[in-house]
């Protein structure tokens, strides 16, 4: 059932969504009527509300209507509100473009990871203090670590080059180049969601534990194959997922390295980094592309926006390792030098327990069952109910033919045959790639 967007006072709400909020909550979401929240807090509330209540496919049907008398009286609040609305629209547009471009890759990753997964492990973390490592240029200053380390996959090469071995690696990137971050024979435990791009060698050498975003597709495979998983929150960056994971595990103090949140004078990533392998010093075009990329700070701005919007109860558990010229932030900071001189009592705080092996015959049977369900749903008689549902069929359509699905929802009388043809074609392609 479609929802009709209702817009007023610089906000966009859905009529059915409003009824679940009481007056106090509505005041907290309304920057003009609320006198108890700061502008930054109100902006964060508005952004969260819009993200959670404007489906991607309804963005084009959502209008934001200003209330001019309020805009004139509360100019600062109005400006902050419209800036947050603009930012939210850009985020949703980015999500739409990303899903259209990478949707098929994410589903292929999911199916490949199910196919290669043989003996998943359970991870238990009991460390009171942890170092969480990103791949920012500041990481080059790290020299000694006395804490358990959770590293994102893009930071692995820089850490190993400095003879620093992480205790666990986390990867959430579903793009095809994400596999380049892993060393030739990785042996450290790896946490990732099914949609991440993980090279087959990781399954051969590393203990594997799955993150679970609680999508219907994940539930289908995890339930049918009896695979243990760790609950996780989806974020625009792996560092966001890693932080939420550590907080969920009850870590009291998290030190952050390589999380620069501002552009540097040189390379934006700590070296060595997988992205630098593509550049040949004898060719000017790739080097010029790399240099130009250093002046494009849009991804850093989005990254910083999320990080600075964390609630205070989470912020107070974080300490960021800062470079000398880093801008001020709302997070406590120390220098890399001070951190290296700090005495920590590192203990074995990660424990792993192997689950039962998964037979290849069982995996192939479950994959065939999945393909058969999606193929049956891509039919004229079932297409409407498949789209209206919130199951694996709808998610498969979004993975395989998101642009066609958006067109169909915008023009219900058109596009059905195009969507069906696209989904069936992509299913055949996937089955051929997996030989199933």
Curated annotation (Swiss-Prot):
InterPro entries: MptE-like (IPR002826)
UniProt-recorded name of the protein: Uncharacterized protein TP_0177
Organism: Treponema pallidum (strain Nichols)
